[in-house]
Amino acid sequence: MLIFTDPRFFVWLWEMEDEIHQCCPIVYWHVWDNDPYPDFNNVLYDSNDLINCLSYKTYGLVKPHFPDKTNYIPHALPTDIYYPLPKDAIERAKIQLLGEKRKDHFTGFWINRNARRKMPNDVLVSWKLFLDELQKKHGHRNATLVMHTDPLDQEGPNLLRTTEHLGISDSIFFSTDRLEFEKINVLHNIADFCLNMACNEGFGLGTLESMQCGKPIIALKTGGLTRQVVNCHDGSENGVALDPDCRDLVGSQNVPYIYEDHVANEK
C-alpha cells in the first residue's frame, strides 16, 4: 500500500497496520516542512516498511532515526507538462491574459494556496515596496504580480482587501479558476520569475514547475525550498535565495512544534 504527504491524513490507516500488514507492506512517500525532527511522528514512522522522502530536507530529518528503511526519492515532473514555450507564443498569451497595456510589464508569479503558512500578505507588502522603488528609480510602475489562488480562501487573509489597503490593486492579477496543466504552464511562461515566501515548505511544487519552464525563482531558504533555490553541487543560486531573518517555534495539538522561518519584506 502506497501512501503519501502529510502523516495527519493517514492516522486512521496506521491504527490498523497489523491488519494491513497481513496483506501487504506499507510504503510512505513522505514530506515534512521544517526542523526540528518530529519525534512525535515516531509511532507513525514505525508503522511503515519503507519511507521514501520527496525532499532532501525530509530525508535529512528522518534518515538518522530510521536508517534502514529511509530513502531519498526526489520530486520530479514530466517534461511534456511543464516546459518553455516559444517567445511568440508567450507574447500572445501574455496579451490575451493580462491585456495589451501590460504586454511589456515585468511579471511575477505566485502559485500557492491562500493560507497563512504561505505568507500571501507578506508577498503583497513586498510587491508594494518593489513598486515604490520602481517608481522612485525609473518613474513608472509597469509591473504585475499574477497570483494563482483564491483571494477569499478561509484559510488565509482577504487578499482583495489587502491589495486595496496597500493601493496596488491595479498591479495584481488574480487567477482563480481551476486550470489544467497546459494553462498552468502558460502562466509560468508569461512570468519573469516565480516567488515563494512560505515560512516553512516541505517542497514547493510551484517553484519546481517554474524552473522547468526556464524561469528563475525567488525563495526563502526553508524546508525543501533551499535545495531548489541553491544548487547543492556548486552553491550557485537558481534565482534569488533569501536567508531567514528570524525563526519562531510554533505548534498545534496535532503538530506540537515546528519552526517557522521569516524574512524581512524589504529584501
Regions found by a protein language model. Give the residues of each.
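Nucleotide-activated donor-binding/catalytic signature segment of Leloir-type glycosyltransferases, i.e.
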Residues: 19, 156-182
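Short alpha-helical donor nucleotide-sugar binding micro-motif in glycosyltransferases
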Residues: 45, 186-191
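Carbohydrate-associated surface elements
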Residues: 57, 76
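A short helix/loop element that forms part of the nucleotide-sugar donor recognition site in Leloir-type
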Residues: 83-101
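Conserved donor-binding/catalytic core segment of Leloir-type glycosyltransferases
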Residues: 99-118, 124-127, 145
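Glycosyltransferase donor-sugar binding loop
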Residues: 139-159, 177
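Aromatic "clamp/platform" in nucleotide-sugar-dependent glycosyltransferases that forms part
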Residues: 199
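Short hydrophobic beta-strand element within catalytic cores of glycosyltransferases
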Residues: 216-219, 226-230, 237-240
